């Protein structure tokens, strides 16, 4: 019987920092998992090396569910982003191994395709309305059928949502970049630039917007009402999700769909939002929510309550996680949309992925397993670089949700 023989943890920064787990069995089969937690990469790497790896040696790689339960329940201390990201890496690697052993792509192990492709959206941004419109046009010309639109708020020095190079990466400094925030200016400006997008390009594509937890429930309700004419696919994270009952107030005042869950990492975090139908899309992602095994549970719960999936997929997901996400997306019946930003050229030097983009959709690899390879030698050219996400401050200097 095959057993887990070795487990390795790699930390490298090819374009951005990724933590990659590689499990090798006694039969010589390898599986990859993503353990990247933006700004806390070394914490997860240490948790894996010091606490998880010793538990895996000698285990049966095919006992995926048992291993998940062992790592979750056996640790006593449960949930949290570090723990769930570490478990996700192991779980994803074991699914990769199972697919390779069976000679099947992971989506076939999950029940096969429910659709021909995975609808994705990417990020259009600008320092002002004209540059935003140019970027929306660029994405539509690339074939995207769904675009998220963000523009810098006039008079505010912060640049959240604004492209900073080939691939927008907010975690770009060794210490947090402190950015000012003006809620009233945002509430005045954002509806107008979303309206400008619709006036220029019409309604023949999906338009999304990320509020990024920055509004109170009342402000979020006001914003949702103000953008109804633009027919958003969703407004994302309109208010901090810790106060889950607040979404009931938002629901009562606007028909703009709501997407929540990017910063959540377990089914218990989103259970109330789903069962009370306070959201339309759940944005938990494979790397931060316990891997394919646990994310499938979240999606199944969501399906019972007519909530669709819309997983996080920014550049803090390595190509390993993106491949796992696409395999799951194409299989589940209640798929909605998948975020997809692409990666830097340096990332492609380290990760080879079989995921392809065409006509606004991603398509999973038909290779056995996830269809991703990791080039350890190439990764050595990109040593770890510490990077933090920004911090927002109101104009009075107090810390605000970024």
From Swiss-Prot:
Matches recorded under SUPFAM superfamilies: Enolase C-terminal domain-like (SSF51604), Enolase N-terminal domain-like (SSF54826)
InterPro entries listed in its UniProt record: D-mannonate_dehydratase-like, D-mannonate_dehydratase_GalD, DgoD-like, Enolase-like_C_sf, Enolase-like_N, Enolase_C-like, Mandel_Rmase/mucon_lact_enz_CS, Mandelate_racemase_C
One MF annotation (Gene Ontology) recorded for this entry: mannonate dehydratase activity
One of the GO biological process terms: carbohydrate catabolic process
SMART domains for the chain: MR_MLE
Disulfide bond sites: none
Record-linked Pfam families: MR_MLE_C, MR_MLE_N
Superkingdom of origin: Bacteria
UniProt name for this protein: Uncharacterized protein ORF2 in unstable DNA locus
Species lineage: Bacteria, Bacillati, Actinomycetota, Actinomycetes, Kitasatosporales
